A protein has these predicted regions:
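Single conserved hydrophobic/aromatic residue that forms the stacking wall/gate
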Residues: 1-7, 11-12
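TRNA-binding/sensing appendages of the translation machinery
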Residues: 13-67
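Short His/Asp/Glu-rich catalytic/ion-coordination signatures at enzyme active sites or charged loops
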Residues: 21, 119-130
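Short, glycine-/Ser/Thr-/acidic-enriched flexible segments
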Residues: 26, 84-87, 104-106, 126-129, ...
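Conserved alpha/beta core surface patches that mediate binding of polyanionic ligands
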Residues: 52, 76-122
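Metal-assisted phosphate- and nucleotidyl-transfer catalytic regions
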Residues: 61-67, 140-205
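His/Asp/Glu-rich mid-to-C-terminal helical/loop segments that flank catalytic regions of hydrolases
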Residues: 94-95, 126, 130-151
Length: 205
């Protein structure tokens, strides 16, 4: 394992990717990532979910077409996927409880952690569920991932400067819930301009 590389500029790292992967920091992050993925799989499988994959080449957008990656496809247009949602909704009547861990591609500049050209994410679909059921699953998944990391990767987390007490709070705390109406009223009380029915973007969250 390499402890470091001379120069950390992006171009140097990209030109020496095979060496960068051997650095202590990168190796640590890959181990943590592996534990996160394993926790997601175990969470859903323990609850009788079926893992379901969808194509990465799709015919259209799911969440808006402004950031789609267009790909030439044998004389036709195709796009890199942003979500497995449409395929999952088609399969849900047959499988009822399904999930995936998959890549998502967006043709946008990677300016912040919220703007990534490619990222991996987990999605789930479940039949015969309401909003509270979905939130229950989401909260339980976060707790399960946090507990898994505390059990499997405490040293790695600390080596990256992560506070284990913060992660313990994610593992053990209750998550407050508020209705959309209340969220709008709270924002208005703080002087935020918002009308009922508008989405809550990152700044409002």
């Amino acid at each position: 394992m390499l402890l470091g590389l001379v120069g950390s500029e992006m171009c140097i790292r990209d030109s020496n990717r095979h060496l960068y992967l051997r650095t202590g920091r990168m190796t640590t992050m890959l181990k943590i990532r592996s534990s996160v993925f394993g926790a997601i799989h175990s969470f859903f499988r323990d609850r009788d979910f079926i893992e379901y994959q969808a194509p990465n080449f799709v015919a259209g957008a799911v969440e808006g077409g402004s950031t789609l990656f267009e790909v030439p496809y044998f004389g036709r247009k195709a796009y890199l996927t942003q979500s497995w949602q449409l395929y999952a909704e088609a399969a849900m009547p047959a499988l009822e409880r399904l999930y995936t861990i998959a890549p998502s591609f967006r043709a946008e500049k990677s300016r912040t952690r919220r703007h990534l050209t490619e990222f991996w994410h987990a999605e789930m679909e479940i039949a015969w569920a309401d909003n509270n059921d979905v939130m229950d699953y989401g909260e339980a998944l976060v707790r399960h991932i946090a507990r898994t990391l505390l059990n499997e990767r405490p040293a790695e987390l600390e080596s990256l400067g992560r506070d284990l007490e913060v992660i313990r709070r994610f593992a053990d705390s209750d998550y407050p819930r508020i209705r959309y109406d209340e969220a709008v009223e709270r924002l208005k009380s703080k002087g935020v301009e918002i009308e009922w029915g508008q989405d809550l973007d990152y700044s409002k969250e």
